[in-house]
């Protein structure tokens, strides 16, 4: 019994501990818990928020705990009494990175304050400043030390000392293990830097027993270390060699931390100290692991519509259901906890459906029979482990073959033909333990013969256990060595048909996609990747023919051709192609681009088949379109392909060039597709960013009449029924079935009630499945086939036991981050799933006013309304244009008085994005009545704060350089970064020198475009009378260029810094960059809703090799703005950059236009005399 009790102590995932006296506080199951340190005993819940919680910290007197909670959508500081009772929310900052760090020591009068860091009021989320927040709930006082990620304070030798941690990465150390880039962290004690050459992560700094303690992985694994206050005497106090020590905290003499789901304590920092594990057991039912129902409409993962459009197979959170469209019940097809079903595909009119399952740990195809009134049939499982990661699954019209696109570039044909029906039915009956239908004498005889066979195999208990939850009867393990299916109860015995896998073709440049069969099932077409991973070509393959398989190139690979489909009469092949080259002039820089490059194209498969868009010597029929054929082939007829001249028969549809996707053939010889509006990358094209005009339109094209019509004005996606007569449309979580060739009305539109699907989630089983699937995704997509020497299976085995402790989506995400952290590679991210439980109250965003307010004698004054930028719609203060001036006093919000201590922020809780009324009294010394204004508070102030931040730094550069240096800041390498770069480029390059600031650059993919602009050279000038000369090339730097980078310059920011140095554009000033250049492509949603990214694309440079990853790019000149520089208002980094630029100007003067002194003489020369 004692052993059983001991094991019970480690069934929970314990995190984020702190201690005070004999009490221990920690986070588990998304709540705070308290436990006694004296010995084993049950912990008790302190909060019941059931939502993500941050690190808790006891107050110095041990009576309260400050912690970070996500109860209000974003993290805010909360305070809860240790003895129980309601907690209080202390901050209403609305930032994304708020975190409690600790408490300040008591002042002589006994008062103390919470120490927290937050990006509130900053332009970037990584710029977290330290704040002191008093327990009475004032908005907090910003401390002057600049951006910090942790702060501790203590009274040492009669003096208040501050310990700061700066320059850390955006990830926790365990999420990128053995990170050695430029953002490993800098430790400061009272302005002096400690341990500058440690060479590993620094985190969790603490004052402990007269020493400085911290966590570091500079020796390969995260452990607890300490040093003297001058940085000498480094000691290691723990010896974890497999799992990282994480999230350490101290009461000043002892240290507690988490490791592998357990809590550990180090009683002192003596040289021989050793950690001990704390025996902590939780009380309660572990509610986060209990089964619960989820709304199907929020978890639709795929749909396949039946032949006539009367019902669909619907994937809901990894399970498959059969749902009639109008009335009728929902029926389970496949629903096994811990098994994920994907990519359902109807097998023609055979009454069967195929889908991908991972029931055996690898992708396999399972074939189930659709529900019938006579009862179910056993499912068959095929090709387990031989398909790779299945990306697409398409059936031929007869339902005998599946085309499979695998992650590794293989295009496979899987035989799913029906085995001998009588034998299969009989064996199913015997295996199920009941006799076959007595009315079927042939079946009964077959069953008797099978049952009496001398070598009949024994019952397969394992297979029966696997099938227990499917709702469709037993599943036969069909992954036999012979490649075929096996009958139930007969493991390893091939069935009469099915299961053979044939590789049709293999791409060497990424996966094939967009598979489609011809109406007769003889031909298969797809989009094949080409040069540079952007070009694609259309290919076709004749699968059945007297000469075997024949692969044909329909297009030549010069363009991006995708989404090929056969028309339902088999006469044409249609596809989408990005081959339009009608350039559009850029209104700002004069560049040209091709935003209207896509159209649908049509290929007559025979030269004898007329193009519906071609001219006819006899003219067109009165109704337009084509003349009816005397021998109309109809749908599903034999497809005749004349290979010669296919490429020359490619013809564009007579529709406007735009952005198209999801091309599909429908009944009546028509086609449908989605047409997307041309909009900007930042969503500012439309007056209202939430306008549905940003969503696609579903259009139908009638080939016979060469006419286009609109079916649905906006939607998310759609699926086509087997006969092409109906479409199932998903629109903002609602499903409806509509006609495929005309606009639906009240009678022809069927709204599909997803509430009939009652899906129950087993969180523990989902997490086990999601964990294994994440492991397979990493194995399949990680950039190095050899996993950079990592034994990935061993890593998965090491962390797998911790799954049984997890009890919330956030805990599962935390565990998964530890696992992916073992890759030691950038861009391995995990986003937690949204839980379906949490606080019962209504959640909305904090409202922000885009202004700096200050409290003076209990009155809240508008100190400064941020000016913003009229070229950025998101960078506008709600108070701009209201007539409110600096100095006005905010007295009421929606008629409620502003508290003199708390300020207006609590009254703006939940007001983000909605209209509120603000009442202002005149500024001090001004007369007049109060004013009421209506404004819409912001949800996110960062764009507004960012423009103000850039303007201030430009002013600094102007002042330091005497106006000779231009200044550009690039916040990222995406749409917003490109916009910001070009917003000020023309003005700033006109100055003699240029400072290009990429500090804090969040990365992206456009560094090449920025480099192209910066490498322009002035070769000459264009002079116009009464106007200033213009350089050729235009918008080129006139003189020296200096780059500024820091440890937050990341990803594509690393790339542009490397390119800047390799191209010798100019010196780089600052700090070594982040060091993360193994990029990701897309995001993978797991079965539980978690999202992971896989490092897929590794950057290599001639000069640096692979070394930029996990190291970064070192500057030419190091410069650092220390906490004291921030406190005293100095700009040493910009100062150094400007100094270098001015020095370079002395030796490399800027390009200047010529004057009119040496213009050519074009006057008429005198006529020379005759000779």
Curated annotation (Swiss-Prot):
CDD domains: cpPDZ_Tricorn-protease, Peptidase_S41_TRI. Belongs to the peptidase S41B family. It comes from the Bacteria. SMART domains: TSPc. Residues 432-498, 1149-1171 are annotated as: Disordered. GO terms for cellular component: cytoplasm. It comes from Streptomyces coelicolor (strain ATCC BAA-471 / A3(2) / M145). Its EC number is 3.4.21.-. Residues 444-456, 466-498 have a biased composition (Low complexity). The lineage of its organism: Bacteria, Bacillati, Actinomycetota, Actinomycetes, Kitasatosporales. Substrate binds at residues 1002-1004, 1079-1081. The active site is at residues 827, 1051, 1109. This is Putative tricorn protease homolog 2.
């Amino acid at each position: 019994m004692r052993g059983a009790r001991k094991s019970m102590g480690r069934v929970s995932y314990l995190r984020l501990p702190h201690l005070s006296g004999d009490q221990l506080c920690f986070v588990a199951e998304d709540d705070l818990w308290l436990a006694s340190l004296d010995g084993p005993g049950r912990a008790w819940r302190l909060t019941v928020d059931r939502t993500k919680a941050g690190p808790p910290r006891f107050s110095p007197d041990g009576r309260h705990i400050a912690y970070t909670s996500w109860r209000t959508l974003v993290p805010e500081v909360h305070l809860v009494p240790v003895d129980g009772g309601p907690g209080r929310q202390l901050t209403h900052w609305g930032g994304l990175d708020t975190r409690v760090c600790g408490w300040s020591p008591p002042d002589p009068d006994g008062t103390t304050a919470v120490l927290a860091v937050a990006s509130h009021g900053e332009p970037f989320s990584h710029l977290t400043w330290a704040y002191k927040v008093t327990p009475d709930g004032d908005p907090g006082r910003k401390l002057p030390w600049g951006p910090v990620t942790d702060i501790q304070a203590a009274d040492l030798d009669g003096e208040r000392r501050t310990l700061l941690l700066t320059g850390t990465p955006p990830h926790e150390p365990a999420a990128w293990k053995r990170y050695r880039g430029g953002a490993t962290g800098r430790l400061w004690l009272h302005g002096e830097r400690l341990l500058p050459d440690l060479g590993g992560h620094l985190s969790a700094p603490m004052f402990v027993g007269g020493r400085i303690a911290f966590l570091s992985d500079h020796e390969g694994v995260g452990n607890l270390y300490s040093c003297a206050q001058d940085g000498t005497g480094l000691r290691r106090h723990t010896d974890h060699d497999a799992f990282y020590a994480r999230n350490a905290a101290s009461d000043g003499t002892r240290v507690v931390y988490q490791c592998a789901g357990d809590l550990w304590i180090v009683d002192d920092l003596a040289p021989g100290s050793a950690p001990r594990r704390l025996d902590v057991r939780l009380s309660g039912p572990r509610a986060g692991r209990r089964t619960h129902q989820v709304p199907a409409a929020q978890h639709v993962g795929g749909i396949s519509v039946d032949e006539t459009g009367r019902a669909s197979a619907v994937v809901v959170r990894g399970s498959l259901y059969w749902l009639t469209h109008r009335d009728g019940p929902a029926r389970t097809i496949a629903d096994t906890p811990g098994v994920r079903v994907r990519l359902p595909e109807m097998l023609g009119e055979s009454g069967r459906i195929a889908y991908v399952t991972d029931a055996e740990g690898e992708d396999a195809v399972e074939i189930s029979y659709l529900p019938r009134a006579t009862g179910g049939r056993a499912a068959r499982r095929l090709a387990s482990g031989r398909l790779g990661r299945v990306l697409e699954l398409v059936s031929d019209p007869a339902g005998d073959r599946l085309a499979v696109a695998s992650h590794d570039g293989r295009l496979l044909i899987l035989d799913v033909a029906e085995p001998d029906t009588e034998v299969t039915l009989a064996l199913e009956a015997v295996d199920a333990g009941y006799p076959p239908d007595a009315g079927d004498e042939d079946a009964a005889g077959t069953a008797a013969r099978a049952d009496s066979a001398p070598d009949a195999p024994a019952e397969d208990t394992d297979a029966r256990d696997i099938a227990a939850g499917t709702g469709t009867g037993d599943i036969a393990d069909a992954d036999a060595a012979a490649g075929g299916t096996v009958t139930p109860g007969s493991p390893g015995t091939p069935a009469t048909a099915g299961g053979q896998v044939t590789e049709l073709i293999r791409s060497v440049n990424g996966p094939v996609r967009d598979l489609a069969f011809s109406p007769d099932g003889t031909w298969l077409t797809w989009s094949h990747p080409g040069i540079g991973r952007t070009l694609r070509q259309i290919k076709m393959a004749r699968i059945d023919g007297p000469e075997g398989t024949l692969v044909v190139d329909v297009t030549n690979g010069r363009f991006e051709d995708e989404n090929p489909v056969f028309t339902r009469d088999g006469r044409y092949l249609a596809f989408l192609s990005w081959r339009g080259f009608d350039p559009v002039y850029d209104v700002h820089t004069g560049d040209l681009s091709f935003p209207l490059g896509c159209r649908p194209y049509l290929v007559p498969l025979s030269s004898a088949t007329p193009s519906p868009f071609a001219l006819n010597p006899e003219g067109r029929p009165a109704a337009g379109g084509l003349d009816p054929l005397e021998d109309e082939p109809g749908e599903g007829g034999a497809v005749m392909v004349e290979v010669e001249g296919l490429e020359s028969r490619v013809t564009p549809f007579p529709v406007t060039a735009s952005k198209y996707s999801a091309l599909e053939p429908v009944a009546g010889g028509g086609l449908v597709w989605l047409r997307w509006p041309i909009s900007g990358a930042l969503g500012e094209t439309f007056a209202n960013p939430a306008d549905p005009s940003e969503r696609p339109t579903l259009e139908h094209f009638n080939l016979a009449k060469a006419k286009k019509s609109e079916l649905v004005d906006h939607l998310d996606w759609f699926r086509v029924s087997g006969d092409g007569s109906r479409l199932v449309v998903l629109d903002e979580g609602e499903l409806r079935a509509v006609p495929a060739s005309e606009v639906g009305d009240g009678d022809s539109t069927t709204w599909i009630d997803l509430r009939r699907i009652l899906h129950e989630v087993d969180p523990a089983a989902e997490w086990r499945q999601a964990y294994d699937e994440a492991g397979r995704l990493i194995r399949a997509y990680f950039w190095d086939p050899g996993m950079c020497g990592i034994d990935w299976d061993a890593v998965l085995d090491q962390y797998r036991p911790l799954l049984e402790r997890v009890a919330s989506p956030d805990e599962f995400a935390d565990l998964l981050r530890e696992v992916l952290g073992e890759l030691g590679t950038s861009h391995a991210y995990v986003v937690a799933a949204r839980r379906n439980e949490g606080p019962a109250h209504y959640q909305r965003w904090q409202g922000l006013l885009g202004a700096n307010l200050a409290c003076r004698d209990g009155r809240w004054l508008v100190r400064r309304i941020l000016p913003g930028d009229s070229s950025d719609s998101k960078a506008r203060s709600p108070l701009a244009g209201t007539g409110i001036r600096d100095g006005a006093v905010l007295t009421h919000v929606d008629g409620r008085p502003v508290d003199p201590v708390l300020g207006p922020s609590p009254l703006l809780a939940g007001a983000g994005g909605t209209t509120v009324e603000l009442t202002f009294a005149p500024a001090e010394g001004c007369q007049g009545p109060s004013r009421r204004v209506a404004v819409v508070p912001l949800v996110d102030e960062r764009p507004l704060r960012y423009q103000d931040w850039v303007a201030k730094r430009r002013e600094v550069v102007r002042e330091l350089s005497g106006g000779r240096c231009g200044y550009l800041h690039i916040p990222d390498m995406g749409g917003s970064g490109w916009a910001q770069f070009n917003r000020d480029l023309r003005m700033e390059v006109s100055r003699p020198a240029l400072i290009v600031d990429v500090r804090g650059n969040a990365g992206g993919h456009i560094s090449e475009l920025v480099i192209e602009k910066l490498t322009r050279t002035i070769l000459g000038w264009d002079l116009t009378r009464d106007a200033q000369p213009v350089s050729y090339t235009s918008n080129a730097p006139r003189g020296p260029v200096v780059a500024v980078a820091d440890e937050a310059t990341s990803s594509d920011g690393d790339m542009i810094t490397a390119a800047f140095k390799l191209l010798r554009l100019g010196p780089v000033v600052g700090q070594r960059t982040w060091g993360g250049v193994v990029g990701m492509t897309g995001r993978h949603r797991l079965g539980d809703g978690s999202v992971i990214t896989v490092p897929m694309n590794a950057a290599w440079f001639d000069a640096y090799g692979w070394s930029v990853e996990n190291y970064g790019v070192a500057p030419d000149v190091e410069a650092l703005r220390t906490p004291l520089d921030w406190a005293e208002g100095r700009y040493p980094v910009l100062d150094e950059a400007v100094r270098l630029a001015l020095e370079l100007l002395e030796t490399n003067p800027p390009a200047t236009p010529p004057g009119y002194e040496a213009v050519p003489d074009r006057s008429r020369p005198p006529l020379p005399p005759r000779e």
